[in-house]
Amino acid sequence: MEVESPEERSPAPGYKRSGRRYKCLSCTKTFPNAPRAARHAATHGLADCTEEMAEAKLKPETDPKAEDASGDKVSGAAAKPRPYACPLCPKAYKTAPELRSHGRSHTGEKPFPCPECGRRFMQPVCLRVHLASHAGELPFRCAHCPKAYGALSKLKIHQRGHTGERPYTCADCGKSFADPSVFRKHRRTHAGLRPYSCERCGKAYAELKDLRNHERSHTGERPFLCSECGKSFSRSSSLTCHQRIHAAQKPYRCPACGKGFTQLSSYQSHERTHSGEKPFLCPRCGRMFSDPSSFRRHQRAHEGVKPYRCEKCGKDFRQPADLAMHRRVHTGDRPFKCLQCDKTFVASWDLKRHALVHSGQRPFRCEECGRAFAERASLTKHSRVHSGERPFHCNACGKSFVVSSSLRKHERTHRSSEATGAPPQQELVVGLALPVSMAGEGPAAPASGAALGDPPAGLLGLPSESGGVMATQWQVVGMTVEHVECQDAGVGEAPGPLGAAGEVGGEEVDEKPPQFVCRECKETFSTLTLLRRHERSHPELRPFHCTQCGKSFSDRAGLRKHSRTHSSVRPYTCPHCPKAFLSASDLRKHERTHPVPIGTPTPLEPLVALLGMPEEGPA
C-alpha cells in the first residue's frame, strides 16, 4: 500500500502540520500522514461534529490554509456551511447521504445484515469489521487477557480497561471515559437531548437502542441466551459478562487484595472499598454511596417510584433485578444450591450468607466489644447499639429506629389503624428487667419513644446470675409509659408509672386494640401479623406437602426443614462439640449451653453503656 505524504492530503480539523507529521491539538499525539490523523480525529468526535464543536478544538494558530478531512478549505474559525441539519439533535452535515447515515443512530435502523449470523449493523464499515470475526481474522490480541479484535482501535479501547486510562473528559461534570462513543453519548445528557421516552414509566433516553433495552425490563423479554447453562439476559453486554463466569475469566484484578472481577464497573466500585471514597451524595438525606447503582436505588426509595410490576400478583418493585428475583417465588425456581447441605436459594447472596454458617467464618469484628459477625450489614446494625444512632424515622409520628425492619413493623400500626378506623396504637417498650441489685441505680431511663424502640442484638431472654428476673421479650401494648422495672418478686407487677392493669399513671386507658377477623373461623386477633399466622393453620392454606409422610406446611422453608428429618441430614455442626442440628436456629440455641470464656464481652454490656447505667463492681 502506498503511503501518502503530508503534501498529498490536508490534515483533519483540530490538527496542525509539524514538519512532515500531523499533531493533534487535543491530546498532542502525532501522525505521519493525513489518513491516520483523520482516523484519530474520530476518537475525539471531530469526524461528525457541528461547526461550533470543531471551532472549540481549533487553536488560533491553526494554519488558515489548512483543509478539513474532505478537502474543503478552512478559513480561520469558519468552515464550509453544513446545510443538512438533523431535526433531532444539533448535528449538521455537508451532504444528504451523511445526514441519512447519521439518522440511523436515532431511528435504530440497521440495514446491513451479516450473511453468517444475521446480526445487523447501521454502517457498512461496522459490518466489514464484524465479518472479520467470522473469518477468524482477529489479528489484534490483548496482552492482558485472551480477548482479540479485528480492528486496532477496538483493541486500544479495550486495553484502557486494564490500564485505567480515560482520555475523554467531560468539560461540564469532569467525568472521564475510555470509549469515545460512550463519551459522545454522555455529552448528549448535558445537552438535554432525550427524545425517546418509555410509555410505561416516562423515563427518557438519548438513543433508541437504550429505550429498547429499557423496555425489556417491563416486558420481561430476555433474548440473549447462554449456551452453557441456558440463562437468558435482556442485554448482550450482560450475557458477555456472564460468559466470563463459565470461562473463569476475571480480567480486572485489584492490586491491593488480588480479587478479580468480570466487569470494569465492579472493579471500580471495589477499589472504593479500599480508599473509602463515596462520591455519590444524596441531596435529600446526606447519605453517601460508593457506587452509582446503590445511589440510584436509594433515590427511588425517597421518590417511592416502583415502575416494575409483577404480572401475576401485581406487586411493584424499584429494580428489574428485584422483579426477576420475585418471579422465582411464583415459578419455584431456586437456582443457587449449597454443596454441603443441598439447600437451595433464590438469590446468590443468600447462598453466600448461608455458606458462612458451614465455614464458621465471622470476619467482621466490632472494635468496641469484640463481637464478630458473618456479614458487614450485621456489624453495621450492631455498631448502632454503641453509637446510639437511630437512622430510620417514621414520617407519621417521628419515632426513630435502629433497623429498617423495625420501622416497617411500626409503620404497620399506622396502616392498620387507618384500615380499621381506630386510633393508631402507641408502642410500649418494656425496659429490660434488671437484677434487683441494678434496679434503681444510674440515671433514669429515657422515654420509650426516644431510646429503646428495638431490642439490641443478643438481649432476648437473658438469664440473671444474681437471681434477678429479666424480661424474656420486648412487648408492644396499647399504651405508653416512661420505664418499667420488674422486681425480683412479682414479675407481673410494675411499680412507678405503670400501676394496676389498665391504668397508666393512675389514669384509665379505655382504648381498644383493633380487631382482625379470620375469614374461615371468625376468630379475632389484635394484630394483622397474628391473623396471618393463624390463617396458615387452616388446611387449605397449607399448600406445601411432604411426599413421604403427607404432612403439610404453610411455607416452603418449613417443608425443607421437615424433609431433613426423613433424610437424617444435619448440616449445622457445633464448633465446640460433635453435635449436629437440622437448622441454624437449633444450633444457636445449643451454643448457649456452652460456657462463655472469661473475658468475652457479654451481650448486656452494650445496653449498659447505652442506658448510661454503672456496671456492678466487686463487693
From Swiss-Prot:
SMART domains: ZnF_C2H2. SUPFAM superfamilies: beta-beta-alpha zinc fingers (SSF57667). Residues 54-71 have a biased composition (Basic and acidic residues). It is found in: Nucleus. Keywords: Acetylation, DNA-binding, Isopeptide bond, Metal-binding, Nucleus, Phosphoprotein, Repeat, Transcription, Transcription regulation, Ubl conjugation, Zinc, Zinc-finger. The keyword Iron does not apply. There is a cross-link at K57, K59, K65, K80, K154, K512 (Glycyl lysine isopeptide (Lys-Gly) (interchain with G-Cter in SUMO2)). PROSITE patterns: ZINC_FINGER_C2H2_1, ZINC_FINGER_C2H2_2. GO terms for cellular component: nucleus. GO terms for biological process: DNA repair; regulation of transcription by RNA polymerase II. The modification N-acetylmethionine is found at M1. Residues 52-78 are annotated as: Disordered. Pfam families: zf-C2H2, zf-C2H2_6. GO terms for molecular function: DNA binding; zinc ion binding. The keyword Hydrolase does not apply. InterPro entries: Znf_C2H2_sf, Znf_C2H2_type. It comes from the Eukaryota. A zinc finger (C2H2-type) spans 22-44, 84-106, 112-134, 140-162, 168-190, 196-218, 224-246, 252-274, 280-302, 308-330, 336-358, 364-386, 392-414, 516-538, 544-566, 572-594. PANTHER family: KRUEPPEL-LIKE TRANSCRIPTION FACTOR, KRUPPEL-LIKE FACTOR 15. Belongs to the krueppel C2H2-type zinc-finger protein family. May be involved in transcriptional regulation. May play a role in DNA repair process. This is Zinc finger protein 668. It comes from Bos taurus (Bovine). The gene is ZNF668.
